[in-house]
Amino acid sequence: MSLFGTTSGFGTSGTSMFGSATTDNHNPMKDIEVTSSPDDSIGCLSFSPPTLPGNFLIAGSWANDVRCWEVQDSGQTIPKAQQMHTGPVLDVCWSDDGSKVFTASCDKTAKMWDLSSNQAIQIAQHDAPVKTIHWIKAPNYSCVMTGSWDKTLKFWDTRSSNPMMVLQLPERYYCADVIYPMAVVATAGRGLIVYQLENQPSEFRRIESPLKHQHRCVAIFKDKQNKPTGFALGSIEGRVAIHYINPPNPAKDNFTFKCHRSNGTNTSAPQDIYAVNGIAFHPVHGTLATVGSDGRFSFWDKDARTKLKTSEQLDQPISACCFNHNGNIFAYASSYDWSKGHEFYNPQKKNYIFLRNAAEELKPRNKK
């Protein structure tokens, strides 16, 4: 905890390492830079579970690689290992015991990476890129869930090359989240499906989307009893929906809010609207972070319906984010998210992962 509770080591010391004496805005929040960041856009981040001592961070990138760092209490990051796919890596997750990392790729496969032996084996196959991967640990089974643009959701026993179950989706699979016993899947055509995972996965409910534009990211949140109770859904139109599965008062409890838009005070001027690239809930406080194509992160209190903080603007989009298991560290990736197409891609631009002390800034607003 030493550095993640002090200001020493934050400062601007991290910027001079890269030989840039000029002031630039790649790290306006003066956060800690992860060493040896990927060489192309960073699509996903995931911290190790609490079962593992210490903190380990995994990132997947469009350079087809998956990297692992140890994050020390001092804030120093040590590259530990790396694995490759033959296409961009779109998602990563951990097994509950922290011994394995699962990776999903545009090469239409998913792999299981054993960290102790540094061996990776293929565990899943789709007919199109695999968009997300989640580990499910139930009392009577454990499996890996993969979703693909081939319009299927598949569940895999890692010991078998054939899926345990295949569920057809109405459209291409865009994003998902899992907190046992709930899974939420968002598809093209603004489709939303909730699955229950007890005994075996099955469809629970289809939900009319609270958002009018393409779904981009989704994250499940818990109630005071630590049970999954709803989800936050982000779209390409700078908006997030907070949706409870069984709210006492749906019209009052479910709501949407605008975010990741240019702050034009002149209301007659057109507003720039950016995609919400990621949503992460703080594991202790239940507050949430959003990151966007505008190059900012924001922290929110959904219960008080208020914004806690917005960052300064980075010089490129924030493509992914996550919290570590106790919520002390907020990790976010600064890299091109392809939201403006290939003509805006600059291969000379460096990609960064930053670590921020999140213990205080995510505390809920005091209720008056």
UniProtKB/Swiss-Prot annotation:
One of its GO terms (biological process) is cell division. Residues 15-34 are annotated as: Disordered. WD repeats lie at residues 37-79, 84-114, 125-157, 168-206, 215-255, 271-301, 310-346. It is found in: Cytoplasm; Nucleus; Cytoplasm, Cytoskeleton, Spindle pole. Keywords: Cell cycle, Cell division, Cytoplasm, Cytoskeleton, Mitosis, Nucleus, Phosphoprotein, Repeat, Transport, WD repeat. Transmembrane segments: none annotated. The modification Phosphothreonine is found at residue 229. GO terms for cellular component: cytoplasm; mitotic spindle pole; nucleus. Plays a role in mitotic bipolar spindle formation. Binds mRNA. May function in nucleocytoplasmic transport and in directly or indirectly attaching cytoplasmic mRNPs to the cytoskeleton. Belongs to the WD repeat rae1 family. This is mRNA export factor.
